[in-house]
Amino acid sequence: MAITQSRPKRKQTGARYKDYKKKKQYELGRSPSLTKLEKRRLKIIRTMGNNQKARLLSTETANLFDPKTKKYEQVKIKTITDNPANRHFVRRNIMTKGSIIDTERGKARITSRPGQDGTVNAVLIS
């Protein structure tokens, strides 16, 4: 069964909406990638217009930006300490945009969308 991003079939009261169109391909959705803290795994997905999207399924490293020196550095991720998207993601070690990660250089906030971009970019928190 396909995941759709269209309007639901039922109203909040439980009554049914009247159908005015069929399901369309552009309404197609996918399940989240839920990027984990493990050995690097990447999945390339075909999107509309024969474009591609890189799904990062798991990774151990992050591209860390230091605002003081204004330089990037690739560092190893130790653990995920906070995730504003879902509090249960912390114990499952799932990374999303806005997550706070503990790295070799200290704590950092993820600025990229790992499930969409295929990389983990982060900014060092002082």
List each model region and its residues.
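Ribosome-associated RNA-binding proteins
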Residues: 1-126
